[in-house]
């Protein structure tokens, strides 16, 4: 995998503020490539960055990450949908293209 691409993805993920999330697709729109490429970078190199702040477009994480991510969301005050436990993407989404 291109080292420059990996660095771009990880730098974008580091910019996501606590209590907010972005999507694989939103990161890909800025870094280039596609959501699956971003997912591959996160799987291989994402340990040192706040990986729980990058989620699927529907506000879910892969089940293997759910418990650890939920603890981070609660600690950071990330908006969750009541009852479902998934992220409230309308309130939690942060766009790396605009910084909002």
What positions do the PLM features span?
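Nucleic acid-binding interface residues in structured DNA/RNA-binding domains
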Residues: 1-100
């Amino acid at each position: 995998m291109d080292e420059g691409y990996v660095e771009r993805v990880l730098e974008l993920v580091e910019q996501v503020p606590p209590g907010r999330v972005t999507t694989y697709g939103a990161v890909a729109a800025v870094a280039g490539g596609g959501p699956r490429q971003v997912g591959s970078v996160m799987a291989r190199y994402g340990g040192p960055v706040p990986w729980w702040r990058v989620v699927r477009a529907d506000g879910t994480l892969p089940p293997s990450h759910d418990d650890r991510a939920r603890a981070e969301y609660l600690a950071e005050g990330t908006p969750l949908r009541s009852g479902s436990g998934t992220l409230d993407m309308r309130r939690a989404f942060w766009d790396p293209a605009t910084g909002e």
